[in-house]
Amino acid sequence: MSSERDQEQLSLEESREGEGKSTTSQTESNASDVAEDPSTKEQTGDKEDSAAARARERKERFKALQARAKSATERNLKETAAETQRLATDPSLLSSLSRKHAFASHNLLKADTEAAGEDFERKRAWDWTVDESEKWDRRMEKKQRHRDDVAFQDYTQDARKVYKRQLREMKPDLEGYENEKMAAIEKAAASGDLEIVETNDGEMIAVDKNGTFYSTADTIGFTESKPDRAAVDKLVADLRKAEEVRLKKRRDRRGGDEDGDVTYINEKNKQFNQKLARFYNKYTTEIRDSFERGTMI
């Protein structure tokens, strides 16, 4: 029995040693395979290269951001300095100084010229041509007429001034007018009311066949015209401006007495009440005060 047990133990030990050797040999073979596999080495190298490339890219982007931040800071400082200088400089003061300098230079030149016994106006005219001098004279004459025309003369003259001012403020749309004109000509030519004829010298003229294209005293085609939104807004703005001017003149005529008692219906009635007040206020003041206090019997 003991011999059989010894044989079994020996066989178990031999089997264990064989399994250990096989495991060791398999591990060594796997390690050798891994060590000798070139694809694994390439994959590891690619990972390291990609990581380095990403690091370099991040570094370059960070440098670019730093450069942009630096340039933005410098630009902001320059703009801030320019804005500070602009705010510190008073434009009205600069224009006043330039006017004073021009006036002083004019007076100095005039004094020097008169001291030398020369004609100042003649000497100053040497700097201008005849055309420039005539244009300047016409401009000064027009300016003087405008100064003389400011005061109220009559309602016809006042209406003429308003009309001239509106003409100056009106900006005609010549391009839009030409486009509408060409569209109307093409429409009339397509309908047969207008015929385009070429002359011998190559000029194109439009012939009104039925006498309906060109307007006459009996033409009512303008009633079909519909103004655009901008023209309507401009008309509304002009009407509001005229109303504001009218109310301002009305307040100026009243002398700012808007909060006082209104005892008149128009300007003429106001003047009449003022005349009455100059003569009868000394007699009626006590009566009016009694009415206001409610003690009048």
Swiss-Prot record:
Subcellular location: Nucleus
Sequence ranges of Polar residues compositional bias: 21-32, 82-92
Coiled coil regions in record: 54-79
Coiled coil is among the record's keywords: yes
Cellular compartments per GO CC: catalytic step 2 spliceosome; post-mRNA release spliceosomal complex; Prp19 complex
Biased composition regions of type Basic and acidic residues, renumbered to the chain: 1-20, 38-63, 71-81
Location of region: Disordered: 1-92
Nucleus recorded as keyword: yes
TM region(s), chain numbering: none
GO biological process: mRNA processing; RNA splicing
Entry keyword set: Coiled coil, mRNA processing, mRNA splicing, Nucleus, Spliceosome
Disulfide bonds: none
Summary of the function given for this chain in its UniProt record: Involved in pre-mRNA splicing.
Entry similarity comment: Belongs to the SYF2 family.
Assembly information from the UniProt record: Associated with the spliceosome.
Protein name according to UniProt: Pre-mRNA-splicing factor syf2
Natural source organism: Emericella nidulans (strain FGSC A4 / ATCC 38163 / CBS 112.46 / NRRL 194 / M139) (Aspergillus nidulans)
